[in-house]
A protein has these predicted regions:
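Long, C-terminal-biased catalytic regions of enzyme "large/alpha" subunits
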Residues: 1-279
Length: 279
C-alpha cells in the first residue's frame, strides 16, 4: 500500500497558472507539489533550513540568501543538463519552453526547534511565512538576473510574466507580521519593475516537495514544511523482499531529555513509550 488521499483545487491552480496561454492545468506530478502541463517536468531542489540555525536561536539570513541564489542558478542549469528521454522529444521541448524549476525547503520544523518556536502556533505560522517569502523573493530575483544574462523562458509572451502585459502580482501575506526575526526586508516592487524590464528565466521558481527520502539522508527531522512525523518510530524498508525495520529516535528530543538530566535507562523507557503510544 502506498500514498494517501488528497484534494486538488483545480480552479485555484488555474488562477495561478503562469502559462495559461499554453494549457489549462489538469494534474500534478506524483507527489502533488507542482501542477504541470502535458509532458512537462519540474527540476526540484530543497534547502535544508536546519543548517541556518545560529547559536542564539536566530536565523543566518545572509547565508540563506546566498544559498537561495546558488540553488536557483543550479536548478536552471539542471533544465539544460537533463538527459530527458530521447524517445519522447516532447519532454525536452516542454521543459525548455517554460523552464520550470522548484526550489523548496526542508527542515522547517528543525529550525523552529532551535528558534524555540512551536510549530502550529501563531508565531510558527508567521515564522514559516517569513522564511518562505524570503526564499521566494530571492529565487525570483535570481531568475530575473538569469533572464538578463541568458534570456527569459521562451513562452514568456502571453504568460503572466509577459513584460508587455504583466499580470503577475506580488504575494500578499494572509498573516500579519508581528516579529521580524532580524530578517532583511524584501521589496516586491523591485521584482515587478525588474520583470517589466528583463522578463524572468523560469515560469515557476519555488515549490515545497515532501522530501521524505532526501530529508532522511540529510538528517532532517521535519520533512518539507511539515512538522516532525514522530519523536520515535520504526521505519519499514523493503530489503530485497524482506521487511527491514529501522528504529528512529529524534536527536533533538534525545538532547532535550539529556539536558533535563535523564539517564540512558529513563530515555530508553520514554522512547519506547513514545514509539508505542505517540507523543
Amino acid at each position: 500500500h502506498n500514498g494517501e488521499p488528497g484534494v486538488l483545487f483545480l480552479d485555484a491552480a488555474n488562477r495561478s497558472n503562469p502559462v495559461p496561454h499554453l494549457y489549462a492545468l489538469e494534474a500534478t506530478n506524483p507527489c502533488g507539489e507542482q501542477w504541470l502541463g502535458p509532458y512537462e517536468n519540474c527540476c526540484l531542489g530543497s534547502i535544508n533550513l536546519a543548517q541556518y540555525c545560529q547559536d542564539d536561536g536566530g536565523v543566518n539570513w545572509e547565508q540563506l540568501r546566498k544559498d537561495t541564489v546558488l540553488a536557483t542558478i543550479f536548478l536552471d542549469n539542471v533544465v539544460e543538463a537533463n538527459a530527458y528521454v530521447p524517445a519522447v522529444p516532447q519532454l525536452r521541448e516542454s521543459a525548455l519552453r517554460a523552464r520550470r524549476i522548484g526550489l523548496g525547503i526542508m527542515g522547517l520544523a528543525d529550525l523552529m526547534y532551535h528558534a524555540g518556536i512551536r510549530y502550529g502556533s501563531s508565531d510558527g505560522q508567521e515564522f514559516g511565512a517569513q522564511i518562505m517569502e524570503f526564499v521566494r523573493f530571492h529565487a525570483m530575483k535570481t531568475s530575473i538576473e538569469l533572464a538578463q544574462a541568458r534570456g527569459p523562458f521562451p513562452a514568456i509572451k502571453g504568460s503572466i510574466y509577459d513584460p508587455q502585459h504583466l499580470t503577475w502580482k506580488p504575494p500578499i501575506s494572509i498573516i500579519e507580521y508581528v516579529n521580524n526575526y532580524d530578517r532583511p526586508a524584501v521589496d516586491w516592487t523591485e521584482i515587478t519593475e525588474s520583470i517589466k524590464m528583463h522578463g524572468i528565466r523560469n515560469a515557476a521558481q519555488t515549490t515545497v516537495a515532501p522530501t521524505g527520502t532526501i530529508s532522511t539522508v540529510a538528517g532532517c527531522e521535519g520533512y518539507g514544511c511539515e512538522p516532525v512525523f514522530a519523536l520515535a518510530y520504526i521505519r519499514h524498508v523493503n530489503d530485497q523482499g524482506s521487511d527491514l525495520q529501522l528504529t528512529y529516535a529524534s536527536p533533538a528530543f534525545e538532547k532535550a531529555l539529556r539536558d533535563y538530566g535523564m539517564n540512558s535507562d529513563q530515555r530508553e523507557k520514554i522512547f519506547e513509550q513514545v514509539m508505542n503510544e505517540g507523543s
